[in-house]
Swiss-Prot record:
Keyword annotations: ATP-binding, Cytoplasm, Disulfide bond, Nucleotide-binding, RNA-binding, Transferase, tRNA processing, tRNA-binding
Name the record gives this protein: tRNA-specific 2-thiouridylase MnmA
Gene of this entry: mnmA
Classification of source organism: Bacteria, Pseudomonadati, Pseudomonadota, Gammaproteobacteria, Alteromonadales
Enzyme class: transferase
GO BP annotations, alphabetical order: tRNA wobble position uridine thiolation
Length: 396
């Protein structure tokens, strides 16, 4: 018996020492205060939300989970596998001893995310539905449901971002893990959303998240990260999009106006794209690969150029609209900051200038490649995410 107790004490101590750097040392007063707060964790069936729930329990909160189903397409292993995700979320909830609620937001997702996705592609732009999903579903529908129906004090998610209160105002900061920082996807949050949301793994790196999950015996510890767009799943993008938008074939031209091929629809192509153009083997043009360098929407023409450094792939700046600022005010005069025009991109030094029409003009310190209308431009001041907007056009 003594040996068993000694072994148990050793394991408990090792586990405690392992997780303490990631959950922070809390005073008795803080633990007592947290025990009066109810937190609803958005649980997706992945490792990040699983560990988020675990950490919040260690911090003394009253924790419950919520599984959201946002798409009504047939779920099976080939597509979104929502049934498997729910099963994993329930297994984690059972392991942690917490309640798991379920909610269907498919109607809200269709109206506010998917229809936007289709309209943008119909216009020849390249949208990011994950950003719209965060804005309309996770930090609107979910937040409202948790507060009104489940009487939550906070919601929590497994996003790799941090928050900080300064002079009574909430800031959103990049996640500590540079490889996983997700502030790019959350720039539409206002400071009131940031104040109502806990991000338990924002100051942890992904390998440590998996280690914590494994130490605690959570079934999701080795589950692959979700990638791509859930409602498309493993299907070919062109096959999926053609179910909802009619193809509009047109010609492919060089920047000089020479016709060299046919495309099936501008919506299937994005700036900087190399694969899938079906225009190889033309000896008179040499061996350099072709890239999409522009779209002429008025003529329904796809413009391609040769070489990864073709001049028309580069822009000196951009115009952004549909702006969201975390502090809800934004800059009123030109400012130096940095911008990302796509996820996991290195910061681009720039000058941001508010325009009279409500847009912003962004000029890069150095020319940038494949700035794509429809994508988001997200602005930073050191580690603080200021906000962002949709790229309306590029400046060459």
């Amino acid at each position: 018996m003594r040996g068993y107790l000694l072994e148990f004490a050793t394991i408990f101590t090792e586990t405690l020492l392992f997780i303490m750097p990631y959950i922070h040392s809390l005073s008795a007063t803080e633990l007592a205060s947290n025990s009066q707060k109810k937190v609803i964790v958005g649980m997706s069936g992945g490792v990040d939300s699983s560990v988020s729930a675990y950490i919040l329990l260690q911090q003394g909160y009253q924790v419950e989970g919520l599984f959201m189903k946002n798409w009504e397409e047939d779920d099976n292993d080939e597509y979104c596998a929502a049934a498997d995700d729910l099963k994993d979320a329930q297994a984690v909830a059972d392991k942690l001893g917490i309640v798991l609620h379920q909610i269907n937001f498919a109607a809200e997702y269709w109206d506010n995310v998917f229809e936007y996705f289709l309209e943008e592609y119909k216009s020849g732009r390249t949208p990011n539905p994950d950003i719209m999903c965060n804005k309309e579903i996770k930090f609107k529908a979910f937040l409202e449901f948790a507060a009104e129906e489940l009487e939550a004090d906070y919601i929590a998610t497994g996003h790799y971002v941090r928050r900080r209160e300064v002079d009574g105002h909430w800031q959103m900061l990049r996640g500590m893990d540079d490889n996983k920082d997700q502030s790019y996807f959350l720039y539409t949050l206002g400071e009131q959303h940031v104040g109502q949301t806990l991000f338990p793994i924002g100051d942890i790196e992904k390998p440590q998240v998996r280690e914590i999950a494994q130490e605690q015996g959570l079934i999701t510890h080795d589950k692959k990260d979700s990638t791509g767009i859930c409602f498309i799943g493993e299907r070919k993008f062109t096959d999926f999009l053609s179910q909802y938008l009619p193809a509009q074939p047109g010609v492919i031209e060089t920047p000089e106006g020479q016709e060299i091929g046919q495309h099936q629809g501008l919506m299937y192509h994005t700036l900087g794209q190399r694969k899938g153009l079906m225009i190889g083997g033309m000896k008179e043009f040499g061996d350099d690969p072709w890239y999409v360098v522009d779209k002429d929407m008025a003529r329904n023409v796809l413009i391609v150029g040769q070489g990864a450094d073709h001049p028309r792939l580069y822009s000196n700046g951009l115009i952004a609209n549909q702006l969201h600022w975390v502090d809800r005010t934004g800059p009123t005069s030109p400012m130096k900051c940095s911008v990302k025009t796509r996820y996991r991109q290195e910061d681009i030094a720039c000058t941001l200038t508010p325009e009279p029409d409500g847009n912003v003009r962004v000029m890069f310190d150095e020319p940038q490649k494949a700035v794509t209308p429809g994508q988001s431009a997200v602005f930073y001041l050191n580690e603080v995410c200021l906000g962002g907007g949709i790229i309306e056009s590029y400046i060459r």
